[in-house]
Amino acid sequence: MHRTIWRYFAVGLFVVGVAASLAGQQAPNDPSPLMLPGHRYDLPATPITAAQIEAHKKNMIAAKNDDVPMNMVKAGGGSDKHQVGVSVVNRNKGQKNPNYAVHDDVAEVYYVVEGKGRMKLGGKISDWKRRPVSAGNGRGSAGTTAVGARDVTIAKGDVLIIPAGTPHKWEDAEQFTSYVVVRVDPDGVAPLMELGTAKFTGAN
């Protein structure tokens, strides 16, 4: 009888001790941010102004470029490969892309700053072809036909998220359209690039 009571008492103390330990881990007394071993927390922020984006867009128009990265930086966290960058893309009125693009590694977030147009998104590409590594998009493939792709219209103020591996192409620009693209590169495939070092060297 006494042995049974002491056994339950010991188990109870053990459970209370484990619970207290977990509670201490979940709610530490130290209010500073959690610093995990092997993670980077010393990277600087990169402000990009509206004036810089506008100047970049105008340089692209003058050089007849349609997609030029502004920068690509280390994103920190648990992998030194993880990167994030910003590009500007311009589409002239009536411009269409003959091919779908699919990025192996890089996800994209579009923010439309001017104009309106239609895109084809998703589906299954039947005529895959590998393409050269892009400065902004890294590795990827292209194709002309995507079964099941859907039409999406994007306009000024809209945001569009395109995960890596999702086919997409510009179907028709109803007017001159410009959008900022945030590109997330988890494997560090695209080259790093400092803000202000963009090259405008003819149509992409």
Residue ranges of each PLM-predicted region?
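Bacterial N-terminal signal peptides
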Residues: 9-21
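Short, conserved beta-strand element in jelly-roll/cupin
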Residues: 104-119, 123, 132-142
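A short, N-terminal "cap"/entry segment at the start of jelly-roll beta-barrel domains
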Residues: 22-102, 194-204
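Double-stranded beta-helix
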Residues: 128-154
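A short hydrophobic beta-strand segment most commonly corresponding to one strand
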Residues: 175-193
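Conserved metal-binding segment of the jelly-roll/cupin
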Residues: 153-173
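His/acidic/aromatic-lined binding-pocket segments of jelly-roll/cupin-type domains
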Residues: 101, 107-111, 151-152, 159-160
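N-terminal secretory signal peptides that target proteins for export/translocation
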Residues: 1-6
